Amino acid sequence: MSGAYRGRGFGRGRFQNWKRGRGGGNFSGRWRDRTDLSKAAGNHASEQASQPLLQQSTLDQFIPYKGWKLYFSEVYSNNSPLTEKIQAFEKFFTRHIDLYDKDEIERKGSILVDFKELTKDNEITNLIPDIENALRDAPEKTLACMGLAIHQVLTKDLERHAAELQAQEGLCNGGGTMVNVPHIYARVYNYEPLTHLKNIRATCYGKYISIRGTVVRVSNIKPLCTKMAFQCAACGEIQSFPLPDGKYNLPTKCPVPACRGRSFTPLRSSPLTVTMDWQLIKIQELMSDAQREAGRIPRTIECELVHDLVDSCVPGDTVTVTGIVKVSNSEEGSRSKNDKCMFLLYIEANSVSNSKGQKAQTAEDGCKHGTLMEFSLKDLYAIQEIQAEENLLKLIVNSLCPVIFGHELVKAGLMLALFGGSQKYADDKNRIPIRGDPHVLIVGDPGLGKSQMLQAACNVAPRGVYVCGNTATSSGLTVTLSKDSSSGDFALEAGALVLGDQGICGIDEFDKMGNQHQALLEAMEQQSISLAKAGVVCSLPARTSIIAAANPVGGHYNKARTVSENLKMGSALLSRFDLVFILLDTPNEQHDHLLSEHVIAIRAGKQRAVSSATVSRVLSQDSNTSVLEVVSEKPLSERLKVAPGEKTDPIPHQLLRKYIGYARQYVHPRLSTEAAQALQDFYLELRKQSQRVGSSPITTRQLESLIRLTEARARLELREEATKEDAEDIIEIMKHSMLGTYSDEFGNLDFERSQHGSGMSNRSTAKRFISALNSIAERTYNNIFQFHQLRQIAKELNIQVADFENFIGSLNDQGYLLKKGPKIYQLQTM
């Protein structure tokens, strides 16, 4: 080991902060023995009472642990039970010292100890048979024993290597080498079992527990004083007084026996005053199926982070916090100071494990996993059994929301959003990350089950957040900057998109959000949320798939208008959705009969109705739209339907959630050459057709959507390669989406109808009207028109529109006309 240290420059670079010198700048001055240290401290000793220091130095010579006073306040005793624990931990760390990075220990001032390794070590369990109970019931003493043990191991290791270096350089070593190792904290992780927040009661006070939750609030980092220097007003004696938990307190007496001073002045700039970094975070519980309670808001608890733990998480992260339960005085209430007896529980964190920061789970090309889940052996067997199903896509799609009849392709789109594609270059600083999360929008008439499918998708997701658009605010979706009542500082509180990081965010009533749409633009494409409020400028991750449901304006979807006109929504937001499904309530005798059977069977409490099928809308297609004709013998929509008389056994949501979490965590598909070629051919054909009619609604966003969804289709079956069949399935789903988006009221595909353009089936009407206005404005030198003038001009041109006000409003939205006042418009094309 010494050779390795010398090879890496141990003597001159490594641990150089731990070698304290009082003399000159040469090497011998940096390595002083104890006699030199006492001489160097002579001036300070003259100010102190000499007799107590002499007794203390005499006692220190008999303590085998040089850092004893850093960890324990009591006097050292060979017969103390603490000594046995320290010796056992010292042997453990000596055996495993090669596994630890000493540079990192020096930089952080702490060492990570795996609790599972401790309990599996035979020697530790023999020497300390009740180590689990000792850590749980007396955590401070046990952690101090671990810290002193690693302190002693590193001190001996450094002294040995320093002696070797001195011998190599021919320096004399008079009275032994003095190595000053600072306080090292033992951080225990992988502690089990996890404690639910609802079980943290008064009985947990002083216990060592582990919790898991989502960070919803992070405070600023502040200095916390642990030791304060006080000067006696009578004799001028300076003493260092400990402040437990950072609570300010005054000494009761002067350390000089002859002095009776009771007045002390704090010396904040004294070298005897010790401060440390301190941060407060708020953890919100993660709700599983067994823990969901109706009508109760999620519980939260505050955690204190100190030293190297500060700045280890941001709002939205899923963290596992291990620490000691403590109490603090409640600052609330109008009672007097002496009457307060209310206490609040909080956790003094010992270790923080951030799911986002586990780099070992990152794939080689920069693909990033979702929130880490734990899988038992039973879960893995169930996942293996699900994957072995013959028609897996059909089973999973029909397990999403069995209560809703039909809409198989819409459910398939939602399931693809749950699985998601692979995010590329997530950790590469030199490249822009490519998002892998698809976004899905469902638009349709009321009463078709959009909200139920949305809630089912959020329930199945390993991490899902469901919000309603008409009650959500812009800050509630993104980030809230709140002011702390006690300190007056601003703190970040995560909104729905940040809490849904690496998961799903379902937004219902998407059309009733008002101006909150603008908050989604950055989150949907850049996968982050930037904040600039009250002097705070920061960016938080929001890598979430957004699935939204919306009702059209007027209550019924008008096919004569585009999606943008039906929703009164901007084109920038609509173009970010990978799939836009249009659900129409069209009367159909066969479909209505099957649907009524299904609803009656569910109401009667029976199993799923035996007859389950849907009848797709048959749209007339002209010869120019051959690319959207289904060429396979049995299309995906037919393969996903449950045949009459066929019995299905849906996967329970709890198990389906585990399956999705496993796929997102461990499966990272790649496109095969055949799949890439199929997607490219489909995209180029779409571009060719859209250019042929003089418009270009097809962009590279559609190609990226195809790639994302194809990767999700392969991930659904736990495959590492996306095949041509996957690409064909995605092309069919995309066709189904486009049939609703680009078809007009006659069922014909019109590529001039972009999602955000005019909804007229014949745009020449608008062009003819604007051309007439141009000629009138040039002739009269006036480009201002009253509404009744516009109506008269349209009547003269014999322009027949169903709603003239909407027609003018459409021209206003597209920038041809500018509304200058009530019923007054200005022509913009002159």
Curated annotation (Swiss-Prot):
Recorded superkingdom: Eukaryota
Disulfide pattern: none
Annotated binding of ATP, by residue: G444, D445, P446, G447, L448, G449, K450, S451
Record-linked InterPro entries: AAA+_ATPase, MCM, MCM8/REC_WHD, MCM_dom, MCM_lid, MCM_OB, NA-bd_OB-fold, P-loop_NTPase
Keywords: ATP-binding, Cell cycle, Chromosome, DNA damage, DNA repair, DNA replication, DNA-binding, Helicase, Hydrolase, Nucleotide-binding, Nucleus, Phosphoprotein
EC number: 3.6.4.12
A Gene Ontology biological process term: female gamete generation
Localization of this protein: Nucleus; Chromosome
GO CC annotation terms, alphabetical: chromosome; MCM complex; MCM8-MCM9 complex; nucleus
Entry-linked Gene3D superfamilies: 2.20.28.10, Nucleic acid-binding proteins (2.40.50.140), P-loop containing nucleotide triphosphate hydrolases (3.40.50.300)
CDD domains reported for this sequence: MCM8 (cd17759), MCM8_WHD (cd22247)
Reactions performed catalytically: ATP + H2O = ADP + phosphate + H(+)
PROSITE patterns: MCM_2
Pfam families: MCM, MCM_lid, MCM_OB, WHD_MCM8
Domain MCM: from-to ranges: 392-599
Modified residues (Phosphoserine): S620
Record GO terms (molecular function): ATP binding; ATP hydrolysis activity; chromatin binding; enzyme binding; helicase activity; MutLbeta complex binding; MutSalpha complex binding; MutSbeta complex binding
Quaternary context: Component of the MCM8-MCM9 complex, which forms a hexamer composed of MCM8 and MCM9. Interacts with the DNA mismatch repair (MMR) complex composed at least of MSH2, MSH3, MSH6, PMS1 and MLH1. Interacts with RAD51; the interaction recruits RAD51 to DNA damage sites. Interacts with the MRN complex composed of MRE11, RAD50 and NBN/NBS1. Interacts with CDC6 and ORC2. Interacts with HROB; the interaction recruits the MCM8-MCM9 complex to DNA damage sites.
Function: Component of the MCM8-MCM9 complex, a complex involved in the repair of double-stranded DNA breaks (DBSs) and DNA interstrand cross-links (ICLs) by homologous recombination (HR). Required for DNA resection by the MRE11-RAD50-NBN/NBS1 (MRN) complex by recruiting the MRN complex to the repair site and by promoting the complex nuclease activity. Probably by regulating the localization of the MNR complex, indirectly regulates the recruitment of downstream effector RAD51 to DNA damage sites including DBSs and ICLs. The MCM8-MCM9 complex is dispensable for DNA replication and S phase progression.
Family: Belongs to the MCM family.
Protein name: DNA helicase MCM8
Native species: Rattus norvegicus
